[in-house]
């Protein structure tokens, strides 16, 4: 297994790259090195004793949100900040440095978990864990409108829809436990297209769709592992994310070569480079 994407380094840039300091995201600044290009030097990630890739340049940012409960994160429409769901019913907007710019209370009140966005329209979707339902969010009013009832199966406790991703006209939904399963629905018709049981995670948490190759990224908040998988559940690569105490939320930032996480326990924002 190899982490993706891998960009071959240019020998002529090797010495210059060695002299550069690690990138530090400061308030108001872009998280890309000044003078950076689309062909930055990159080396293969190291692997730990568990066979997990070790991410580079791990950084943490305070959000100032006191009540624990961050559950999901997605990039905003402009790619310069985030939407973060809180399971007490709030949807936050933050910058790259964790600064909160708005907090919208969602109606109805629910145990909100996974976030997703249709990038072609900017439509935001969110899932309600215990209800096992998908809603569309109006950020102006905070109104959440039901769009998919889903399948009410499995345990009756709070181990339902935990992660949500949108891609290629489909919803991908992670059911946390009992069963540990990923459902795929056609968004337009609401038809269930497939369901795949997974045996490797302890808790299915957030999902992210990778539109470069149609694969999924899945966080396991209990084992502290990030997995890149095919939609049939086949593992492509796995990463150690134990630097996040309880990694509930994840999003992929291909523009900057970063993985972003939110911690359910601390409400901190974390980043790490996969390059």
In which residue ranges do the predicted regions lie?
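C-terminal motif of bacterial Sec signal peptides marking the signal peptidase cleavage site
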Residues: 15-17
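Bacterial signal peptide processing site
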Residues: 19-22
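A short helix->beta-strand "capping" segment at the edge of beta-propeller domains
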Residues: 44-68
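A short beta-strand motif characteristic of beta-propeller blades
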Residues: 56-64, 99-106, 143-155, 191-198, ...
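Beta-rich, blade/repeat-based domains predominating
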Residues: 65-77, 109-119, 153-168, 199-214, ...
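Conserved beta-strand positions in repeat-built beta-propeller and related beta-rich domains
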Residues: 76, 83-88, 124-132, 173-178, ...
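Short loop/turn segments that connect beta-strands within beta-propeller blades
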Residues: 95-99, 138-142, 186-190, 229-234, ...
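Blade-level signature of beta-propeller repeat domains, shared across WD40, Kelch, NHL, RCC1
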Residues: 249-275
């Amino acid at each position: 297994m190899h982490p993706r994407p891998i960009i071959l380094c240019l020998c002529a840039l090797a010495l210059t790259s060695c002299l550069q300091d690690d990138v530090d995201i400061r308030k108001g600044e872009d998280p890309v090195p000044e003078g950076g290009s689309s062909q930055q030097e990159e080396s293969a990630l190291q692997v730990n004793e568990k066979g997990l890739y070790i991410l580079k340049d791990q950084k943490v940012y305070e959000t100032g949100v006191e009540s624990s409960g961050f559950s999901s994160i997605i990039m905003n429409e402009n790619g310069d900040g985030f939407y973060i769901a809180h399971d007490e019913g709030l949807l936050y907007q933050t910058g790259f440095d964790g600064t909160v710019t708005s907090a919208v209370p969602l109606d109805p009140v629910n145990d909100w978990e996974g976030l997703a966005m249709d990038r072609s329209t900017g439509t935001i979707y969110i899932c309600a864990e215990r209800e096992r339902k998908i809603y569309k969010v109006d950020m102006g009013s905070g109104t959440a409108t039901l769009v998919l009832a889903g399948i009410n199966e499995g345990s009756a406790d709070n181990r339902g829809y935990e992660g949500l991703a949108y891609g290629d006209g489909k919803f991908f939904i992670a059911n946390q436990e009992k069963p540990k399963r990923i459902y795929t629905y056609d968004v337009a018709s609401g038809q269930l297209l497939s369901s795949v049981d997974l045996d490797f995670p302890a808790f299915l948490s957030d999902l992210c769709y990778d539109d470069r190759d149609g694969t999924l990224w899945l966080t396991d908040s209990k084992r502290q592992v990030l997995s890149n998988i095919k939609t049939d559940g086949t593992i492509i690569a796995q990463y150690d994310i134990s630097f996040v105490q309880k990694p509930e939320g994840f999003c992929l930032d291909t523009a900057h070569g970063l993985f972003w996480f939110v911690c359910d326990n601390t409400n901190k924002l974390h980043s790490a480079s996969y390059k």
